């Protein structure tokens, strides 16, 4: 991949993406680090996602699986401090309330906003605080430069912010891809206790994106382990808004794009493993035969 270049940035580096984050005291912190974030695309996105294989998946995962069926979305709302897991029907209703409010504030239709939560399991989501957060963010705090704030907002036991970006020269132009992630404990295949958001300004079919993402996750996040636990909320999203005007159509470009998705997933998987709770070393094993 000689045309691949790592660049400064994160989830808002690709054209057309903005983000914002605020502190709402979902979990009280002395440093008042943000705990609610919104990631938004100016244009409709083709999307793909992979979710936890835990049979007791959290309410946001149940909701997001339904939204994903349309293959299109515009935004993601994320909160840390409360996982909205093991919360029954009420949890699903709460996630839906957050989704609908974000769609109203952004002027979107139904099922255009994914909702994600991470944090304490078994407690009801403090919906009022999440709603307060997204009302503060939309539209006042949505900005290109706030990608790093969003990356901070999704952290729980993480000790470092996790974000990166790449640029790829294709036959018809240049595309960018960015990512942010959280994860440091309960890390075990398949996937881990992680939330990962990958954005690109390439234009691509949802089915092609799903193939690329599933293959990349198998070779990256599904090979991570820290402590042997698989979580209830694991989710990774790939959003492509086409803002670059570069369409992924030829087999050559699809292969290059798939390699790009794998590169950024591998980068983020290493960052997650490196930040494992109590970890002092990162070990990679290559098996042959």
Task: Label every PLM stretch briefly.
Residues 96, 101-221, 231:
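Glycine-rich, mobile lid/loop segments that gate access to catalytic sites or pores
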Residues 56-67, 92-106, 210-223, 259-269:
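Short, well-ordered amphipathic alpha-helical segments that serve as non-catalytic structural scaffolds
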Residues 1-52:
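N-terminal amphipathic/basic leader segments beginning at the initiator methionine
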Residues 76, 80-89, 111-132, 225-247, ...:
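Short, surface-exposed loop/turn segments at secondary-structure boundaries that line and modulate
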Residues 202-260:
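Carboxylate- and glycine-rich phosphate/diphosphate-binding segment that chelates Mg2+/Mn2+
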Residues 38-97, 189-209:
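Glycine-rich phosphate/pyrophosphate-binding loop regions near the starts of catalytic domains
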